């Protein structure tokens, strides 16, 4: 097998994401004509420690959200350096871009520019070798299909309603296969829609395809999801579990958590107890960003209280960054990391974060962003690293469904070699 193939062209363009904001798409062409194409996602609630997403700031165009600077960085600075390099050496490609940027947070070239190139190179390499992307990244051991973490009620920054917590999700950990898990979630989604309608609630959807009703409280969102699970013919806590993403950094003010929709302001200890009560009352298997990104003491309290029973995922806390993750591991906070490619900006650094997490006994959940495209890289990535969990929205809106459909194709390709771990994906908690 050939182990060297030159990059002959690197080209970027500005396209639109699912929130009608510009983003970067990159094409990488190889000497034999093979091409790899990748598009970059974007978040609404972003961690303060994420790599920099370069925006133009010209208010007269796309409200300042244009990405022509990032596109130009790809077409000039990055292309000049990468043309002639071996596309099969992903580490060297990413290292070259990191050195070209020269900042701690990708502020010069932009994480959106660098990630587009990094992923397009990986896709071009996979295409050249005639391999699926998950096989190219993960090798022969890539075989685990993920449990979906499916956002079906949106609140917080993802919706215009009075629900404080950002995401209420279902996880079909009791399903026998990925395709069955997807079917179960789809049926619950339909049941939830009819349940909300029958109770007089709006069934408009948020950024990630989940419903965004004006519920009376955060707990009511859980109650109505439980009702929908039962209505669809499944057992909560056996077939399907609940997962939450409060996105607590968004409601953290002056050292306290402001649940404005419920008229409550809680200390970190009280916030931890709030989750404890919910986890005792309902089949909650995972809580993401239960505490704010800089509330390390609050995270410690929460982890000590329920870290043995509930998956505690660090998103804004860790931002797919090995330095932040190493601190969390040392302090003993959280037990899982959310993986978002654009938080760190290259495929290599993303894989390093996943490896560090797994060595420490932390699970990894591969995730989309609220601003997505039709790009399906994360579907391949989650199988490549055998993470066992994926978070990519409701089974609605084509930019979300694209990832699920790609996973169906991968499941079909893996056939008997594929493995759906279900509850075993939560190997570091007692369930």
Curated annotation (Swiss-Prot):
Subcellular location: Cytoplasm; Secreted; Cell surface
Keywords: Cytoplasm, Glycolysis, Lyase, Magnesium, Metal-binding, Secreted
GO cellular component, one term: phosphopyruvate hydratase complex
EC number(s) from the headed UniProt entry: 4.2.1.11
Substrates-to-products reaction catalysed: (2R)-2-phosphoglycerate = phosphoenolpyruvate + H2O
BP-aspect Gene Ontology terms: glycolytic process
Residue positions binding Mg(2+): 245, 288, 315
Source superkingdom: Bacteria
Keyword field contains Flavoprotein: no
Protein name from the UniProt record: Enolase
Originating organism: Clostridium botulinum (strain Loch Maree / Type A3)
